């Protein structure tokens, strides 16, 4: 196994790419979907079962982990991999996005941000330097630069100011990250939906130099059309030979559209969160297992799916345990959704390698257009 | 595999017994502990993992299943085994106990009992005949006779009246059960803590004749001393050559004491319920994982335990995920508790077979007397 972090592109099809990220903790096949293990667990899943769905890498959240159990405690306990029993690569975000979306009483300055915990109201501080320290204590393999995300809606001027602050923070992140062989630091492009700002941000990041580049500030309510609009040009501003990570995306059709536009990595809570709210994702679209139409249905969610939920249980059972608020409903639906997402990624990788992405995408949309199987 | 239900005693040690119940769906090694899968799931566990802990048989609850998803629906879907993905033996209770403890507005007559659902207030009826029908629709391997449990505290006269009603219902249950090769009907001894009533009840049941005999009306708040007092004589009133099932028991030391007194089968929600409330059972007693002493503890719950929670996670992790209300806390602690219970049963079976139960029980109590490992 390699002792350094590297990325090899093995095939392209149009703007879409497939390849392999190598790390000392294992390979990440791209395009990759990263399940989210917010607070040291992918909710309702054992890590060996997350791996069994085909996940090569998990995402952990700096904001949640710094508050509880704290980065220092995780470090004393041997790091996040050991703590949560996942020995493959972990990417941690920088905390910037969650501070914006979850914390109370934020106070922003050039230096960083102070805020109060949403758990107990305690006061905390994040800066590029502290975020790098926390992510080092957690032991993450892919570290994200600390950035600021403006609350939407925002004027173009506010987006520009915020992006330039994030670029100054990106440089401080790079300096604070230091020399850590086998670990990677990714910069995060900002600039909202404004092409000039995206280009300026990308240029600033390339000037600093990172092992990978994220596209931030999307999937925050702008809608798929606006997001794809940015993805039509933004990946092209980034170096060809480094992985491109679209943060917080998304629904299956968002993922397919992003991969078509040259994205290599994504993460989203959607498959696991949906599992806990009774939503399943299949080749034929979304299934609401709460719906009474499933009450007597002996068929699996998707007869072509090989996940445990589809292999061994009827829609009627899944409906029953969801309605009865049984934990197994979250366990089985989350497993199914993560399995479906990873199967989709494998399909995309195979199609790109074969130069048949167009056919794959057409079949993907055709199956969804059919909709769910007819009620019995 | 056998096509009939049978019980073979293979060894005894004092009053304790070990043996095998054979059914068309597999063998049940006794003494057996049956995890409770109330509404079609052992909470927070996948059935294959319940099996991996060593469970030979599960218990399902007639009361819960008749209300939701209904016995008729389960039958249309192929029976409870298929519905919940458990192909080994299932014992169902008769519904009598839960009607007493959970339902609203009960109305009792010689014929049976009407009540309102605790879920939606809908009106339902149970009688010996309807309970037999429901348990047949569910497809359970071991069917329990329909009985009445008096609310405690009760006068001896009330306990006697209730027991005699249950004995008349036991006869009606036997008649309604019919001829079902491979399936068993168990009668339930009642009579509270009064020896004469227990003897009268046992005689009535033996006169009717059952494939097995349960001891009901214990573990309902009378305390361990009173329960053991009854178990000092009650099993002796029952036929030697049929399994004896103590309903709703219990804590590990209750189980050991019951096995010493000649009990072959038990069930209890305790290991799974405790798992969801942060209580773990180990060789050294009870561990409250919520306690702050575990916050920095890198050691497993029990270093000698081979369950996934102990093999791969620290007390600090279990503490963290419990405090963060993560589903994995319920999953891992339930798994550990069920594993511990089954390991205890295997220890009891092996000790009885070797004629060394006394030593085993002494070591069991000695380890518990030591208490949990010292904090770091």
Curated annotation (Swiss-Prot), chains A, B:
Active site, renumbered: 93 (proton acceptor), 267 (nucleophile)
Pathway assigned in UniProt: tRNA modification; tRNA-queuosine biosynthesis
Keywords: Glycosyltransferase, Metal-binding, Queuosine biosynthesis, Transferase, tRNA processing, Zinc
EC numbers, comma separated: 2.4.2.29
Residues given in the record as Zn(2+) binding sites: 305, 307, 310, 336
GO cellular component: cytosol
Enzyme category, top tier: transferase
Named cofactor requirement(s): Zn(2+)
Pfam families recorded: TGT
The reaction(s) this protein catalyses: 7-aminomethyl-7-carbaguanine + guanosine(34) in tRNA = 7-aminomethyl-7-carbaguanosine(34) in tRNA + guanine
Cofactor descriptive note: Binds 1 zinc ion per subunit.
Record has Acyltransferase as a keyword: no
Matching HAMAP family: Q_tRNA_Tgt
Protein name per Swiss-Prot or TrEMBL: Queuine tRNA-ribosyltransferase
Gene responsible for this protein: tgt
